[in-house]
Curated annotation (Swiss-Prot):
HAMAP family: GrpE. Participates actively in the response to hyperosmotic and heat shock by preventing the aggregation of stress-denatured proteins, in association with DnaK and GrpE. It is the nucleotide exchange factor for DnaK and may function as a thermosensor. Unfolded proteins bind initially to DnaJ; upon interaction with the DnaJ-bound protein, DnaK hydrolyzes its bound ATP, resulting in the formation of a stable complex. GrpE releases ADP from DnaK; ATP binding to DnaK triggers the release of the substrate protein, thus completing the reaction cycle. It comes from Francisella tularensis subsp. novicida (strain U112). The lineage of its organism: Bacteria, Pseudomonadati, Pseudomonadota, Gammaproteobacteria, Thiotrichales. GO terms for molecular function: adenyl-nucleotide exchange factor activity; protein homodimerization activity; protein-folding chaperone binding; unfolded protein binding. The keyword Cell membrane does not apply. Its main location: cytoplasm. Homodimer. This is Protein GrpE.
Length: 195
C-alpha cells in the first residue's frame, strides 16, 4: 500500500471515527431533548390535571350551592303554601266577628216572655255553632279579663283606678279579641287598671 493510500485510509478512518462521534453526540443530544420533552410533557400534564381538579372543585361547589338554593326555594314555597292555607280565611273570619258580637249582645238582655226565652235558646245554639265552626278553622277567642295588658293582643279603651288589682291588669273586656292560627285578627278592647 502506498503512502497516499494509507493516508486516505487513515483519513477515512478518522472521518468514520469522527462521524461516529458526531453521530453519538447527536444521539445523546437527541436523547436529552427527548428526556427534556418528556419532563416538559409531564409538567404540562400535571398543570392540566391541576386545572381540571380546580375546575372539578369549582363545579362541585356550584352544584352544592345550586342544590342548597333549590332546597331553600322548596322550603320557602312549602312555608308560603302552609301560610296560605292557614291564613287564607283571615278576611272571612274578620267579617264574621261582628255577627258573633251582635249575637252575644242580644244574649246579654234579659227576656221574660216564654217565646222570647225559646228564641234566646235558639240564638245561644246558633252562637255556639258559629264559635265551634270558627274554632275548627283555627279562630280562637281571647278572654283576657284578669290578665296583664299586652299591646300586641289588647287595645286599651279606658283606664280605671282599683286598689284591689295591680296596674295594667285587665279589669273588663268591651269586645273580645280573636286569633287565627296564633295571629291576631282583632285585638281585644279592654279596660285596664291604672292606680
Amino acid at each position: 500500500m502506498s503512502k497516499q493510500e494509507k493516508s486516505n485510509v487513515e483519513d477515512k478512518s478518522l472521518d468514520i471515527e469522527t462521524a461516529a462521534q458526531v453521530e453519538t453526540a447527536q444521539e445523546s443530544a437527541s436523547g436529552a431533548l427527548e428526556e427534556l420533552s418528556v419532563e416538559e410533557q409531564l409538567e404540562r400534564a400535571k398543570d392540566t390535571i391541576k386545572e381540571l381538579e380546580d375546575s372539578c372543585d369549582q363545579f362541585k361547589d356550584e352544584a352544592l350551592r345550586a342544590k342548597a338554593e333549590m332546597e331553600n326555594i322548596r322550603k320557602r314555597a312549602e312555608r308560603d303554601v302552609s301560610n296560605a292555607r292557614k291564613f287564607g280565611i283571615e278576611k272571612f273570619a274578620k267579617e264574621l266577628l261582628p255577627v258573633i258580637d251582635s249575637i252575644e249582645q242580644a244574649l246579654k238582655h234579659e227576656v221574660k216572655l216564654e217565646e222570647a226565652i225559646a228564641m234566646k235558646e235558639g240564638i245561644e245554639l246558633t252562637a255556639k255553632m258559629l264559635v265551634d265552626i270558627l274554632k275548627k278553622n283555627g279562630v280562637e277567642e281571647l278572654h283576657p279579663k284578669g290578665e296583664k295588658f299586652d299591646p300586641n293582643l289588647h287595645e286599651a279603651m279606658a283606664m280605671i283606678p282599683n286598689p284591689e288589682f295591680e296596674d295594667n291588669t285587665i279589669f273588663d273586656v268591651f269586645q273580645k279579641g280573636y286569633m287565627l292560627n296564633g295571629r291576631i285578627v282583632r285585638a281585644a278592647k279592654v279596660v285596664i287598671v291604672k292606680n
